Amino acid sequence: MKKDIFDIEMELVGREVYSDRLFLGHFAPTNGEQVVPICLPGQFVEIQVKNCDGVMLRRPISVYAATERTLDLLIQNAGKGTEVLCNAPVGSRFNILLPLGNTFRIPEAGARPLLVGGGVGVAPMYALGCAMKAKGIEPTFLLGARSAGHFSDLSHFDSVGELFITTEDASLGEQGYVTQHSILRAQKFTHIYMCGPTPMMKAVARWAREEGIPSQASLENHMACGIGVCLCCVEPTVKGHKTVCNDGPVFDTTELLWD
């Protein structure tokens, strides 16, 4: 195991519930003297879920935010394992492996980055936006979902950069997909970053390529081990097959065989 990966017992110390299927969990080490390892934008954790029939493997969750004392994870109920996490009361304890994966390349000062997120893919976009703002770069967020009830707290994003929204049912923001939003025609961007459902990212990457804008994507392939051993998350690239958990999850979209 890499020396910079830690195995930490953490307690769920707070919850921000957005729907019956989505919440932001605040975790802290059970050992008060333990410091949360530095987690870079795009990196993720693997949570061990105990006492759940049929769930043997850890669950990968993107890092939303992290400090020396707390770790925030945006968790969506997508199956047995994450259902346990979504229903866990404050005070529940979990073994968490972190930090895993690579990170985004942040542009130089003066850049105009667009951060595109869909579903729980908004989590690494928030972490990235905060990192950019800390370096004096103003990010623009473009977030999409089926309806308004599928979003987390949008005020978090609005406090970091300019925010634009799309929903398929027109319940919030512009109706349609992120690639149909008027902001793509109204403003010029120098860099594109994305995380969300693969069809969404493919469409965004295609648009970015047509516009001649470099783009990076954080992939959401199914993962098991989180350290590149089991090979269940392999993604074909122009440089051969890569493990998303270890070589990624962040890739330059020119590396991906999406066409």
Regions found by a protein language model. Give the residues of each.
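Structural signal for conserved beta-strand scaffold positions within catalytic alpha/beta enzyme cores
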Residues: 14, 65, 165-167, 217, ...
